[in-house]
Structure formats: C-alpha cells, structure tokens
C-alpha cells in the first residue's frame, strides 16, 4: 500500500521540524502591541486597539507541478488565496488584504497573465485587496514557478473565535470541498503519474481528466463563514487541509471529535485510493475526503449553518459531534479525533 511518506511527505517529521523552529523563537515585544494567545491555531494575531490584526501565510505546494504539466496556471492563485483566507476565518477574522510572492526560474508573459487572472478571481471571491507583492527570478535555485502569499485580516477582540468554547454536546457541520484542494498532491501525483502511468490528459473512471480534478481550485469559504459568525453563536472553526480531520485538535484539545456521519466520498478520492491501493486511514490523514471546512455549534444551530452554506451554493452536513471520550476496541480514548468510515474506527493521531 502506498503512503504519503512514500510520496516524499512525512507529516510527522514536518510537525517535529516546526516544533524545532518554534522552540528558538523566544523574543516578544514588551509594549502594548502584544500577540494573542493563539499558539498552534490557524492564524497569528497581535493587539491593535480594540482589534486583533491577523496574519496568515501559505502557498500551493506541489499543485504548481501539475499546473506546469498541464500548462494551466489560472487556478493555482485561487488555491494560494484560499489557503490563506480560509485559515484567517478560523478565528473569526475578516480577510482584507493580500501580498503575494512569486519565485520563478523563467516565466512568459502568457503564464504571468494566467497567474494575474487567477489572483483577480481569488481576491474577488474573498473580497480582499491585493496591495503589493514580490517577483524573484531565481534560475539557479528553483525549477518552474512557486507562488505564496500573506493575508491580513481583522477581528474585534470580543468577537474572536478561539475554539476554546467547543464542548461535549456540540455538533460538527462539514462544508463540502470542491475536490482535492491544495493538500495531498504529492501522493496524488505518485498514484496517477508513477503507479498508474497516466498523464494530465488521461480520463478517470468518472469522466474528468487528471488535470481537471487536480487543478480544480480550493473552495473559498469566506463569505458563508463570515455570515455564519454574524447570525449564529459559532463555537469553533476548522479549515480541513494537510492532516485531514487532525486539524480539529487545533481548537479545544480537551475533548473528542467524533466524525461518524460523513457524506459520500468524492470521486477523486475514490480514484486515488483504488489506483494506489491506499489504506482508509492514510486517505483520511492525507486528504480532506470531501469536507473542506468544519463549523462547530450547538445542536439547535446546525440547521441554520447548513441553510447559510446552501445559500452560498456549498453543500453542508452534520458529520459528527463533540464528546468527552470515545470507545475504540474496548479502550476509552480522550483528547482525540475519531473517524468512523467503512465499518472502521480510526484514530487520527
């Protein structure tokens, strides 16, 4: 069975590397401009009067490799923006501005124009301004193009959604993803291009080509989630990216997140699993599996969350609940994420 690690990505090693880096960051300002207590969350924030200024930074990873193979660059900028703004809204902040960074080996005017179109589409959907950026020509350092960005968002101090209010009895509403989004591309590429000897133009069993599936842009959840925050007492918000539902542990770590009512898995994930003989647990540790964002609320508020999401043409479902503990193989587990799928109980560590 092929794994994400076989494809060159070790998420546990990445966790250790991040901890090693963070352990050396000890300096903090001592004046009134102080960081919010959000370590380990989706975004960082600093105090600014009655507000927090929120910053997120991210890129598109190896999705750009597929863009180069297909010579199609107009969707990956949407992915870059989505990865940033979807993280910012996880603490209830409204994204307002973006700066981008593009590193290139060489680039044509046509590719630049495609990237520009994608940037415009992404900022329009997110309702943010692109206020600057940097393009670096680095022919001796990289091959192709890499694209990243940083988003500024704002939230009133008394309106921040930290996830600390998540408690047993709450329910988890999952918002549909558009597909693979921007995580797990290394494993997907290994399955399609190495194991199955397909190319970007190859048709998959459900009719779409490999390029169409892998280059479908990440769903931007800004508008529906900001509306939800205004209308409902939201307890926690989670962008489901690398590591899958493990991301829920960024919220309240003292509870169990039980995912036991998942909707139909999207075709792209079935293709990857079948062609690569990928285990269920590996799939759920690597991909979003059709749920790109989670909203945690009181049970009575779930219907309103689903209504708002549907109004924005995003399907939504109650996919689970918060519990004090869960039972797995006769053992009581606490402070964890449990996914029940295909008659299996899988702990997402």
From Swiss-Prot:
What EC designation does it have? 6.3.3.1
Query: One cellular component GO annotation, for this chain's record?
Result: cytosol
Localization per Swiss-Prot or TrEMBL: Cytoplasm
Name of the top EC class for this enzyme: ligase
InterPro entries on file: PurM-like_C_dom, PurM-like_C_sf, PurM-like_N, PurM-like_N_sf, PurM_cligase
| Pathways involved | Purine metabolism; IMP biosynthesis via de novo pathway; 5-amino-1-(5-phospho-D-ribosyl)imidazole from N(2)-formyl-N(1)-(5-phospho-D-ribosyl)glycinamide: step 2/2
Gene Ontology terms describing biological process: 'de novo' IMP biosynthetic process; adenine biosynthetic process
**Origin organism of this chain?**
Methanococcus maripaludis (strain C7 / ATCC BAA-1331)
Q: What is its main location?
A: cytoplasm
The terms under GO molecular function for this entry are: ATP binding; phosphoribosylamine-glycine ligase activity; phosphoribosylformylglycinamidine cyclo-ligase activity
Q: Which residues form a coiled coil?
A: none
PANTHER family, per the entry: TRIFUNCTIONAL PURINE BIOSYNTHETIC PROTEIN ADENOSINE-3, TRIFUNCTIONAL PURINE BIOSYNTHETIC PROTEIN ADENOSINE-3-RELATED
- The molecule here is called Phosphoribosylformylglycinamidine cyclo-ligase
Q: Which reaction does it catalyse?
A: 2-formamido-N(1)-(5-O-phospho-beta-D-ribosyl)acetamidine + ATP = 5-amino-1-(5-phospho-beta-D-ribosyl)imidazole + ADP + phosphate + H(+)
Family affiliation = Belongs to the AIR synthase family.
Keywords, comma-separated and alphabetical? ATP-binding, Cytoplasm, Ligase, Nucleotide-binding, Purine biosynthesis
- NCBIfam families, alphabetically? purM
């Amino acid at each position: 069975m092929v794994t994400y690690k076989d494809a060159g990505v070790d998420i546990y090693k990445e966790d250790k590397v991040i901890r090693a880096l963070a352990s050396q960051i000890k300096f903090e300002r001592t004046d009134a401009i102080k960081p919010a207590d959000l370590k380990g969350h989706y975004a960082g924030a600093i105090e600014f009067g009655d507000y927090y200024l929120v910053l997120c930074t991210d890129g598109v990873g190896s999705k750009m490799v597929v863009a180069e193979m297909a010579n199609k660059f107009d969707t990956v900028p949407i992915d870059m923006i989505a990865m940033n703004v979807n993280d910012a809204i996880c603490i209830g902040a409204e994204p307002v501005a973006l700066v981008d960074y593009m590193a290139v080996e060489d680039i044509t005017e046509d590719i630049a124009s495609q990237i520009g179109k994608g940037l415009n589409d992404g900022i329009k959907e997110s309702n943010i301004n692109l206020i600057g950026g940097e393009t670096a020509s680095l022919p001796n350092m990289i091959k192709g193009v890499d694209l990243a960005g940083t988003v500024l968002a704002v939230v009133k101090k008394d309106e921040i959604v930290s996830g600390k209010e998540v408690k047993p009895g709450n329910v988890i509403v999952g918002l549909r993803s558009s597909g693979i989004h921007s995580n797990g591309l290394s494993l997907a590429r290994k399955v399609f291009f190495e194991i199955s000897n397909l190319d970007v133009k190859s048709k998959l069993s459900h009719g779409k080509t490999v390029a169409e599936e892998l280059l479908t842009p990440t769903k931007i959840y800004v508008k529906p989630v900001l509306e939800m925050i205004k209308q409902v007492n939201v307890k926690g918000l989670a962008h489901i990216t690398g590591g899958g539902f493990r991301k829920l542990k960024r919220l309240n770590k003292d509870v169990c997140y039980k995912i036991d009512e998942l909707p139909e898995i999207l075709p792209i994930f079935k293709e990857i699993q079948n062609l690569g003989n990928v285990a269920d647990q590996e799939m759920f540790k690597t991909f979003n599996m059709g749920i790109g964002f989670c909203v945690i609320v009181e049970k009575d508020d779930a219907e309103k969350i689903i209504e708002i999401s549907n109004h924005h043409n995003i399907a939504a479902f109650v996919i689970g609940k918060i519990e004090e503990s869960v039972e797995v193989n006769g053992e009581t587990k606490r402070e964890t994420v449990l996914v029940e799928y295909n008659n299996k109980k899988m702990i997402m560590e």
